[in-house]
């Protein structure tokens, strides 16, 4: 960077999420940055280059200017028009409507960017605007000017001054402001997601982000006063509880399987005197605060309201879903009469009149999954609700106990009486005498069970028994918090990056754990792509599990094994699917639910046209490759030979058989082709004019097939006859089959473009480029280009574009070294410059329409552009916090992106791999990350890992553990029990 006054000092450790270029609003001063050239005002001083770079990195940009228009080449997310100051000798620019004074212009730009001022960099050539930006509290103020202007700019308060913006080097990343977080923030705490007002527009998003669960069940963070409707959507979901319904859609009968919305146990309604039943709104909540403590798994909400006769009441609610006893949950509500005396009426209920209505796209589908409801009174304040799903015939039971802490007062006020205020809604009503300044506590404990549970007689008896043995709210809460402490001791990741990034890391970890922590041999459930947080994707299981397993395998490998068992139990259905398609082996479904059949709908709804269009994503057979990859990675981490013999080897062999059966030999060049498939990019399901035909030689599929055949052969050789003999006999594994695999793995075709760039598929290079800027300008969010182009009568099949990473998935799953070895085995060179060219090519051709895309791009960029990697990572970390996909997080979080973003910090930035019975480390920590500290369990041995820009520190806990071999930057070392080893880090300059 040229012309910097001394060494620039960036205040604090803040990462800035937006750059605001504020041009001096006098006519002559404008020309100091925008110089007239060929009748166009072209940005000078590097401004255009800076903005181009920032937009590529996902950093928001804004311009405050007095000019009526900016040049077309000068792209900014926000443009705000400003008036010249009153004392400007040229006078105000006339005929320019909707202009703002300088201070208002800066504030307006910040609001339109939805980034708090403290996270905005202001760059300006005006000493007046420097002074204004400092006064308004903007995080960093950079002066722009030559040597003659440097003094006045610094005197006005600029942190430093430059004369060339293109080389401006700042800690920039897509940091989300308070508004973009749905009104939530972490403040100074990396453990608390806090909201300070009620916002009906954001309530669905908040309900998902404040979901509480334990892997067996999860409950959305909805207001306990509300039933489904308007901004509210209470929902409770139990792992593996699915039901099928049929719907007539445009003359066709469509059958869908959904994760079932279970009875709502949180419902608690109340009123003061004979007033209305209170429901919080933006108008009637005097004070409102909601806090999710991810360290303890407790959701707290406090509000004050004043009724229509002026009585003020404070209501504080705490809620948890037990991490200690997976069938239990609790909710405590404290009522305080601030300025009135009289009767408080409270209804504690279970609402079984629920349906699946969380996803607008499914509004035309049948949605009532629960059948008849049976209610039983179990004693004072205790009720049992029993129901059953209509098709799968899964019985669900909810037993609920409600207590008023000062029970003597409750009895004097009429005690508790059973109440059924609406069909299928039941519970108890309490009339409580209150005095001004007095508080009363109402607690409800619930037990939920299903007929899928082990070691029970009936769900009703099991729920009633669990509730009878349950302690008080405080007793259950104490054990719940202790269970979370144990989980955090294994899964916490410290980065030192500050409140918001730290909160995003912890929140993502929290939601992953809530979705899987009950995994075990008794719970037959997979990894739902949207967690247990909503009804998005119908609650189905996709390949997203591949992004979740690494985080689990290195800490709780038994969870990974249990969830891989979900796939193994459905292997027979996958075999049957392959046979029906005319293939050998096992063809796993793109979307899986209860029994492993293909659940992918054949049509999807385009809200832009109101029409249903074909959905051909069931051609993504690569889900089987992901399953096999997860099996092998689990084995590499655990050396669990028993798992291979009992389940893993069979999964790998049958998937290998399927893909080996897909290949067709081309004698012209002695290569093998795979046709009729889709890669990870869902925007290409065929060629122009032939949607749904599949692709020829998708690079990801072909390379992964070669990898699978190689590793399956290695696994067979490793197990040999001693371990695998009976299995090989049962599978009828023949020598000629293995010989065929050995040949296929070396002769599969991989397409390339000019410059050694891996082609996404054969024929990709023949497609025209896409007009990215045109569509971004027209539509803003273009993650769903498939729907946008369909509405225009076009198709994503026609262009060089992708919804998400496809080819680059290979560099996500494999190091560049391992990928190079694979391609060389197949007869192709892939030198380092080809790796860089491939990454650069696809970097600018993705719509990032999947939350997984930023995860993959962050990982891939970590070796080439560490700042760019951090930029992608911050977007991945905040995908659900900012609802990056546009009003989708209310339908459930994106579990793969949450787990994958945390995994980047641990495995990617440390370069951690498990190969050849060693831990491999190749650190590449970005400059924005002061440190990464975490723990893993490698083959039952606890290892603490700490990485800073200067050193890698490894500590193997004391005990009888054998030494662990570690590879660090080309050298192999032994780490012994109780030993701490330090290794200097040579971080690349990228």
Task: For the regions a language model picked out, list residue spans one by one.
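Short, acidic loop-to-helix structural element flanking the phosphoryl-transfer center
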Residues: 36-63, 103, 107
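Acidic, Mg2+-coordinating phosphoryl-transfer loop and its flanking beta/alpha structural elements
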Residues: 121-160
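Acidic/polar, glycine-enriched structural segments that form the non-catalytic walls/loops
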Residues: 180-537, 792-793, 989-990
């Amino acid at each position: 960077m040229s012309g910097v006054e001394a060494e620039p000092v960036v205040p604090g450790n803040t990462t800035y999420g937006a750059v605001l270029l504020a041009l001096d609003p006098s006519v002559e001063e404008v020309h100091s940055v925008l110089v007239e050239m060929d009748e166009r005002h072209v940005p000078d001083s590097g401004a255009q280059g800076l903005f181009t770079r920032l937009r590529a990195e996902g950093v928001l940009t804004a311009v405050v200017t007095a000019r009526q228009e900016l040049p077309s080449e000068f792209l900014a997310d926000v443009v705000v028009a400003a008036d010249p100051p009153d004392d400007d000798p040229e006078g105000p620019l006339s005929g320019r409507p909707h202009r703002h004074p300088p201070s208002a212009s800066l504030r307006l730009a910040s609001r339109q960017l939805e980034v708090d001022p403290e996270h905005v960099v202001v760059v300006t050539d005006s000493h007046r605007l420097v002074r204004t930006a400092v006064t308004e509290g903007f995080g960093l103020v950079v002066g722009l000017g030559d040597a003659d202007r440097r003094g006045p700019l610094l005197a006005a308060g600029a942190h430093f001054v430059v004369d060339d913006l293109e080389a401006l080097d700042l800690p920039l990343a897509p940091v989300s402001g308070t508004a973009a977080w749905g009104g939530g923030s972490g403040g100074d705490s990396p453990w608390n997601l806090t909201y300070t007002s009620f916002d009906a527009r954001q309530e669905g998003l908040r309900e998902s982000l404040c979901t509480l669960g334990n892997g067996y069940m999860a409950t959305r963070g909805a207001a306990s006063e509300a039933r489904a409707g308007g901004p509210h959507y209470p929902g409770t979901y139990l792992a593996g509880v699915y039901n099928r319904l049929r719907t007539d859609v445009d003359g066709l009968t469509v059958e869908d399987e959904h994760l079932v919305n279970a009875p709502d146990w949180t419902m608690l309604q109340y009123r003061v005197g004979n007033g209305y039943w209170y429901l919080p709104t933006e108008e009637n909540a005097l004070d409102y605060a909601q806090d999710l403590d991810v360290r303890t798994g407790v959701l707290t909400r406090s509000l004050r309201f004043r009724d229509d006769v002026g009585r003020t009441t404070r209501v504080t609610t705490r809620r948890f879903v037990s991490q200690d006893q997976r069938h239990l949950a609790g909710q405590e509500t404290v009522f305080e009469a601030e300025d009135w005396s009289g009767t408080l009426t409270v209804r504690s209920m279970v609402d079984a009149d629920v349906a699946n209505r969380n996803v607008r796209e499914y509004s035309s589908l049948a949605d009532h999954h629960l059948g008849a409801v049976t209610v039983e009174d179990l004693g004072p304040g205790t009720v049992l609700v029993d129901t059953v799903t209509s098709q799968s015939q899964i019985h669900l039971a909810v037993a609920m106990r409600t207590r008023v802490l000062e029970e003597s007062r409750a009895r004097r006020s009429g005690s508790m009486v059973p109440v059924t205020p609406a069909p299928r809604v039941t519970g108890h009503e309490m009339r409580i005498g209150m005095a001004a300044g007095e508080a009363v506590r109402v607690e409800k404990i619930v037990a939920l069970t299903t007929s899928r549970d082990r070691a029970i007689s009936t769900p009703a008896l099991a729920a009633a028994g669990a509730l009878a043995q349950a302690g008080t709210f405080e007793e259950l809460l104490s054990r719940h918090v202790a269970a979370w402490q144990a989980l955090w001791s294994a899964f916490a990741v410290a980065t030192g990056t500050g409140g918001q990034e730290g909160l995003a890391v912890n929140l993502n970890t929290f939601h992953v754990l809530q979705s899987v922590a009950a995994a075990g041999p008794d719970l037959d459930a997979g990894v739902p792509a949207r967690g247990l947080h909503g009804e998005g994707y119908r609650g189905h299981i996709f390949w997203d599990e591949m992004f979740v397993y690494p985080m689990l395998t290195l800490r709780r490998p038994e969870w990974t094994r249990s969830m891989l068992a979900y796939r193994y139990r459905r292997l027979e259905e996958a075999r049957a699917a392959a046979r029906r398609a005319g293939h050998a082996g096992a063809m796993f479904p793109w979307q899986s639910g209860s029994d492993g059949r293909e659940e992918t709908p054949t049509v999807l709804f385009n809200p832009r046209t109101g029409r249903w269009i074909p959905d051909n994503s069931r051609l993504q057979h690569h889900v089987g490759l992901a399953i096999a990859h997860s099996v092998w990675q689990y084995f590499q981490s655990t050396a669990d030979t028993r798992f291979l013999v009992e389940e893993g080897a069979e999964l790998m062999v049958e998937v290998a058989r399927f893909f080996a059966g897909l290949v067709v030999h081309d004698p012209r060049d002695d290569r093998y082709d795979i046709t009729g498939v889709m890669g990870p990019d869902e925007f290409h399901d065929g060629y122009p004019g032939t949607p749904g035909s599949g692709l020829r030689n998708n690079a990801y599929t072909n390379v992964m097939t070669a990898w699978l055949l190689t590793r399956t052969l290695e696994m067979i050789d490793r197990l040999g006859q001693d371990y695998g003999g009976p299995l090989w006999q049962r599978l009828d594994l023949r020598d000629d089959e293995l010989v065929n695999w050995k040949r296929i793995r070396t002769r599969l075709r991989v397409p390339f473009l000019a410059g050694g760039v891996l082609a996404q598929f054969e024929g990709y290079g023949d497609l025209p480029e896409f007009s990215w800027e045109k569509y971004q300008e027209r539509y803003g969010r273009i993650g769903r280009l498939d729907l946008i182009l369909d509405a225009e009568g076009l198709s994503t099949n026609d262009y060089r574009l992708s919804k998400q990473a496809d080819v680059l998935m290979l560099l996500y799953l494999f190091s560049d070294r391992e990928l190079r070895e694979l391609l060389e085995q197949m007869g192709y060179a892939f030198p380092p410059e080809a790796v860089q060219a491939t990454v650069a090519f696809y970097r600018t051709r993705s719509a990032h329409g999947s939350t997984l895309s930023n995860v993959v791009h962050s990982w891939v960029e970590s070796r080439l552009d560490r700042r760019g990697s951090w930029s992608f990572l911050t977007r991945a970390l905040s995908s659900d916090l900012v609802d990056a996909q546009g009003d989708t997080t209310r339908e459930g979080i994106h579990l793969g992106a949450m787990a994958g973003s945390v995994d980047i910090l641990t495995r990617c930035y440390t370069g951690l791999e498990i190969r050849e019975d060693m831990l491999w480390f190749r650190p590449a920590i970005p400059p924005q990350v002061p440190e990464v500290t975490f723990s893993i369990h490698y083959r039952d041995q606890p290892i603490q890992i700490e990485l800073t820009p200067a050193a890698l520190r490894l500590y193997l806990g004391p005990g009888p553990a054998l030494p662990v071999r570690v590879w660090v930057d080309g050298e192999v070392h032994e780490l012994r029990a109780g030993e701490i080893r330090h290794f200097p880090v040579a971080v690349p300059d990228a």
